[in-house]
């Protein structure tokens, strides 16, 4: 639907809070009457947009992880996916989503994060059995570090070190998977 696409584009660029229903309608090429016939308010649209983003990213992650390729190549593809999904994202969007006090939105994020972590840990354990992941890796530590990445996305001092939130996201993802070792040398 044009309204949801327009809303996603606007939210991605300016955040949820700064975008008005009028701006969404203008970008979608619809009247406010059409908007309100379909959606009660901006929050409903924001939740639908986030559900769609989460669903699509889960689907793409699952497709990558089900491929018949070696684990390091799967990780490379996941990193490319992260890069694609973070392209053009604004700091405002990240802040609006992570600092939002709306209960439904928070529950959506908590559930998506939990589900994503469970899938990821499952795949890491499988890779561990195949010898791709250190045998001594403590998975609760890994989960803690994954949660810490979300906290880092709110760190104003850290954010200020990068030209864009997209650059910071990629730095965090690469650091998480590769540490400080050149992944070129790991080949």
Each model region followed by its residue ranges:
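All-alpha amphipathic helical-bundle segments outside canonical DNA-binding/catalytic cores
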Residues: 72-73, 111-113, 129-145, 163-167, ...
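Hydrophobic alpha-helical connector segments
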Residues: 48, 52, 61-88, 143-146
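Phosphate/oxyanion-binding loops and surfaces in catalytic or ligand/nucleic-acid-binding neighborhoods
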Residues: 56, 67, 78-89, 130, ...
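HTH DNA-binding helix-turn interface
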Residues: 12-16, 29, 36-48
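Short, amphipathic alpha-helix enriched in basic
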Residues: 1-27
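Secondary-structure edge/capping motif, primarily at the C-terminal ends of alpha-helices
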Residues: 64, 93-101, 153, 157-158
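C-terminal peripheral helix-coil segments that are non-catalytic and often amphipathic
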Residues: 118, 122-130, 147-149, 155, ...
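Short secondary-structure transition hinges
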Residues: 80-121, 132
